[in-house]
Swiss-Prot record:
One of its GO terms (molecular function) is magnesium ion binding. Its cofactor is Mg(2+). InterPro entries: Aldolase_TIM, ThiamineP_synth_sf, ThiamineP_synth_TenI, TMP_synthase. Pathway: Cofactor biosynthesis; thiamine diphosphate biosynthesis; thiamine phosphate from 4-amino-2-methyl-5-diphosphomethylpyrimidine and 4-methyl-5-(2-phosphoethyl)-thiazole: step 1/1. Keywords: Magnesium, Metal-binding, Thiamine biosynthesis, Transferase. This is Thiamine-phosphate synthase. Binds 1 Mg(2+) ion per subunit. The keyword Metal-binding applies.
Length: 211
Protein backbone atom coordinates (compact mmCIF):
# COMPACT_ATOMS: atom_id res chain seq x y z
CA UNK A 1 0.00 0.00 0.00
CA UNK A 2 1.45 3.34 -1.08
CA UNK A 3 1.07 5.59 1.95
CA UNK A 4 4.33 7.54 2.21
CA UNK A 5 5.24 9.87 5.07
CA UNK A 6 6.35 12.35 2.40
CA UNK A 7 4.40 14.02 -0.43
CA UNK A 8 3.47 11.59 -3.16
CA UNK A 9 4.94 11.42 -6.65
CA UNK A 10 3.27 10.02 -9.78
CA UNK A 11 3.57 6.24 -10.22
CA UNK A 12 5.36 6.97 -13.49
CA UNK A 13 8.06 9.63 -13.20
CA UNK A 14 9.05 8.98 -16.81
CA UNK A 15 12.57 9.43 -18.08
CA UNK A 16 14.72 10.42 -15.08
CA UNK A 17 18.24 11.60 -15.98
CA UNK A 18 20.78 11.90 -13.16
CA UNK A 19 23.36 14.57 -13.96
CA UNK A 20 26.21 16.39 -12.24
CA UNK A 21 25.90 19.95 -13.51
CA UNK A 22 23.44 22.80 -13.91
CA UNK A 23 24.37 22.92 -17.61
CA UNK A 24 22.99 19.40 -18.07
CA UNK A 25 19.88 20.25 -16.05
CA UNK A 26 19.17 23.18 -18.37
CA UNK A 27 19.88 21.24 -21.57
CA UNK A 28 17.63 18.36 -20.62
CA UNK A 29 14.75 20.45 -19.33
CA UNK A 30 14.87 22.40 -22.59
CA UNK A 31 14.77 19.04 -24.42
CA UNK A 32 11.51 18.09 -22.70
CA UNK A 33 12.63 16.07 -19.66
CA UNK A 34 10.35 16.65 -16.66
CA UNK A 35 11.99 14.55 -13.91
CA UNK A 36 15.67 15.08 -13.20
CA UNK A 37 18.25 14.79 -10.42
CA UNK A 38 21.31 16.88 -9.62
CA UNK A 39 23.97 14.57 -8.20
CA UNK A 40 27.20 16.30 -7.20
CA UNK A 41 29.42 14.16 -5.00
CA UNK A 42 31.95 14.83 -2.27
CA UNK A 43 31.77 18.60 -1.94
CA UNK A 44 30.88 20.81 1.00
CA UNK A 45 27.46 22.44 1.12
CA UNK A 46 28.90 25.90 0.50
CA UNK A 47 30.67 24.65 -2.62
CA UNK A 48 27.46 23.40 -4.24
CA UNK A 49 24.89 25.88 -2.94
CA UNK A 50 25.00 28.12 -6.03
CA UNK A 51 24.46 25.09 -8.27
CA UNK A 52 21.57 23.87 -6.12
CA UNK A 53 19.92 27.31 -6.25
CA UNK A 54 20.31 27.46 -10.04
CA UNK A 55 19.02 23.92 -10.55
CA UNK A 56 15.95 24.53 -8.39
CA UNK A 57 15.20 27.76 -10.27
CA UNK A 58 15.37 25.86 -13.57
CA UNK A 59 13.09 23.18 -12.18
CA UNK A 60 10.51 25.82 -11.30
CA UNK A 61 10.82 27.54 -14.67
CA UNK A 62 10.08 24.30 -16.51
CA UNK A 63 7.58 23.01 -13.93
CA UNK A 64 9.79 19.95 -13.51
CA UNK A 65 10.37 17.45 -10.70
CA UNK A 66 13.89 18.43 -9.62
CA UNK A 67 15.50 16.17 -7.02
CA UNK A 68 18.70 17.05 -5.18
CA UNK A 69 20.93 14.10 -4.34
CA UNK A 70 22.31 14.07 -0.81
CA UNK A 71 22.41 17.81 -0.01
CA UNK A 72 19.16 17.73 1.91
CA UNK A 73 19.79 20.84 4.00
CA UNK A 74 20.25 22.92 0.85
CA UNK A 75 17.22 21.25 -0.74
CA UNK A 76 15.11 22.29 2.25
CA UNK A 77 16.60 25.79 2.41
CA UNK A 78 15.88 26.52 -1.25
CA UNK A 79 12.71 24.43 -1.53
CA UNK A 80 13.54 21.77 -4.09
CA UNK A 81 10.82 19.46 -5.36
CA UNK A 82 12.54 16.57 -3.62
CA UNK A 83 15.62 14.89 -2.17
CA UNK A 84 17.21 11.59 -3.17
CA UNK A 85 19.24 9.65 -0.61
CA UNK A 86 21.41 6.56 -0.70
CA UNK A 87 21.12 3.90 1.99
CA UNK A 88 24.26 5.20 3.68
CA UNK A 89 22.68 8.67 3.98
CA UNK A 90 19.48 7.58 5.72
CA UNK A 91 21.04 7.26 9.17
CA UNK A 92 22.69 10.69 9.06
CA UNK A 93 19.79 12.65 7.55
CA UNK A 94 17.00 14.40 9.44
CA UNK A 95 14.11 12.77 7.59
CA UNK A 96 11.58 14.58 9.76
CA UNK A 97 13.01 17.93 8.59
CA UNK A 98 12.57 16.89 4.95
CA UNK A 99 9.04 15.76 5.72
CA UNK A 100 8.19 18.98 7.59
CA UNK A 101 9.47 21.05 4.67
CA UNK A 102 7.08 19.24 2.33
CA UNK A 103 9.79 17.79 0.08
CA UNK A 104 9.47 14.44 -1.68
CA UNK A 105 11.97 11.71 -0.81
CA UNK A 106 13.49 9.03 -3.01
CA UNK A 107 15.70 6.26 -1.61
CA UNK A 108 18.21 3.98 -3.36
CA UNK A 109 18.12 0.21 -2.83
CA UNK A 110 20.19 -2.73 -4.08
CA UNK A 111 18.59 -5.81 -2.49
CA UNK A 112 15.66 -7.04 -0.40
CA UNK A 113 17.19 -5.94 2.89
CA UNK A 114 17.70 -2.40 1.60
CA UNK A 115 14.14 -2.37 0.26
CA UNK A 116 12.98 -3.21 3.81
CA UNK A 117 15.00 -0.25 5.13
CA UNK A 118 13.57 2.04 2.46
CA UNK A 119 9.99 0.94 3.11
CA UNK A 120 10.45 1.67 6.81
CA UNK A 121 11.28 5.28 5.90
CA UNK A 122 8.05 5.51 3.83
CA UNK A 123 9.59 7.59 1.03
CA UNK A 124 7.86 9.04 -2.02
CA UNK A 125 9.56 6.55 -4.35
CA UNK A 126 12.07 3.71 -4.25
CA UNK A 127 14.97 3.36 -6.69
CA UNK A 128 16.04 -0.17 -7.64
CA UNK A 129 19.55 -0.81 -8.90
CA UNK A 130 21.76 -1.45 -10.39
CA UNK A 131 20.00 -3.36 -13.11
CA UNK A 132 22.96 -3.84 -15.45
CA UNK A 133 26.73 -3.37 -15.06
CA UNK A 134 27.55 0.33 -14.87
CA UNK A 135 30.70 2.39 -15.25
CA UNK A 136 29.19 5.52 -13.70
CA UNK A 137 30.10 4.70 -10.12
CA UNK A 138 31.78 1.91 -8.18
CA UNK A 139 29.13 -0.53 -6.96
CA UNK A 140 29.72 -3.02 -4.13
CA UNK A 141 26.74 -5.12 -5.22
CA UNK A 142 26.25 -7.28 -8.31
CA UNK A 143 23.90 -6.24 -11.12
CA UNK A 144 20.34 -7.37 -10.38
CA UNK A 145 19.19 -8.15 -13.90
CA UNK A 146 15.66 -8.00 -15.25
CA UNK A 147 14.26 -11.05 -13.43
CA UNK A 148 15.28 -9.70 -10.02
CA UNK A 149 13.97 -6.25 -10.93
CA UNK A 150 10.61 -7.76 -11.92
CA UNK A 151 10.45 -9.61 -8.59
CA UNK A 152 11.03 -6.37 -6.68
CA UNK A 153 8.36 -4.61 -8.76
CA UNK A 154 5.85 -7.36 -7.92
CA UNK A 155 6.67 -7.00 -4.25
CA UNK A 156 6.34 -3.20 -4.25
CA UNK A 157 3.01 -3.30 -6.14
CA UNK A 158 1.65 0.27 -6.32
CA UNK A 159 4.77 1.96 -4.92
CA UNK A 160 6.40 4.36 -7.41
CA UNK A 161 9.68 2.81 -8.52
CA UNK A 162 12.71 3.89 -10.54
CA UNK A 163 15.14 1.46 -12.17
CA UNK A 164 18.76 2.61 -12.47
CA UNK A 165 22.09 1.22 -13.55
CA UNK A 166 23.47 0.59 -17.02
CA UNK A 167 20.18 1.36 -18.78
CA UNK A 168 20.73 2.23 -22.43
CA UNK A 169 18.35 3.20 -25.22
CA UNK A 170 18.44 -0.42 -26.40
CA UNK A 171 17.74 -1.89 -22.96
CA UNK A 172 15.09 0.62 -21.86
CA UNK A 173 12.02 -1.16 -23.35
CA UNK A 174 12.85 -4.44 -21.59
CA UNK A 175 13.37 -2.59 -18.30
CA UNK A 176 9.99 -0.87 -18.57
CA UNK A 177 8.38 -4.20 -19.46
CA UNK A 178 9.03 -5.35 -15.86
CA UNK A 179 6.38 -2.86 -14.74
CA UNK A 180 8.81 -0.38 -13.19
CA UNK A 181 7.39 3.12 -13.16
CA UNK A 182 10.44 5.02 -14.37
CA UNK A 183 13.98 4.65 -15.66
CA UNK A 184 16.93 6.68 -14.43
CA UNK A 185 19.80 7.13 -16.86
CA UNK A 186 23.23 8.69 -16.63
CA UNK A 187 25.75 7.81 -19.33
CA UNK A 188 23.04 6.83 -21.86
CA UNK A 189 22.59 10.58 -22.29
CA UNK A 190 25.73 12.31 -21.01
CA UNK A 191 28.12 10.02 -22.88
CA UNK A 192 26.01 9.59 -26.03
CA UNK A 193 27.52 10.60 -29.36
CA UNK A 194 24.37 12.68 -29.88
CA UNK A 195 22.76 13.46 -26.54
CA UNK A 196 19.76 15.18 -28.14
CA UNK A 197 18.93 12.12 -30.21
CA UNK A 198 19.44 9.80 -27.22
CA UNK A 199 17.20 11.98 -25.05
CA UNK A 200 14.48 12.09 -27.72
CA UNK A 201 14.59 8.30 -28.11
CA UNK A 202 14.42 7.73 -24.36
CA UNK A 203 11.54 10.20 -24.01
CA UNK A 204 9.69 8.29 -26.73
CA UNK A 205 10.23 5.07 -24.78
CA UNK A 206 9.72 6.23 -21.18
CA UNK A 207 7.67 9.41 -21.55
CA UNK A 208 7.73 12.44 -19.26
CA UNK A 209 5.76 10.79 -16.47
CA UNK A 210 2.24 11.23 -15.16
CA UNK A 211 0.95 14.56 -13.89
Amino acid sequence: MYQPDFPTVPFRLGLYPVVDSVAWIERLLEAGVRTIQLRIKDKRDEEVEADVIAAIALGRRYDARLFINDYWRLAIKHRAYGVHLGQEDLETTDLKAIQAAGLRLGVSTHDDMEIDVALAAKPSYIALGHVFPTQTKQMPSAPQGLAQLARHIDRLADYPTVAIGGISVERAPAVLATGVGSIAVVSAITQAADWRAATAQLLDIAGVGDE
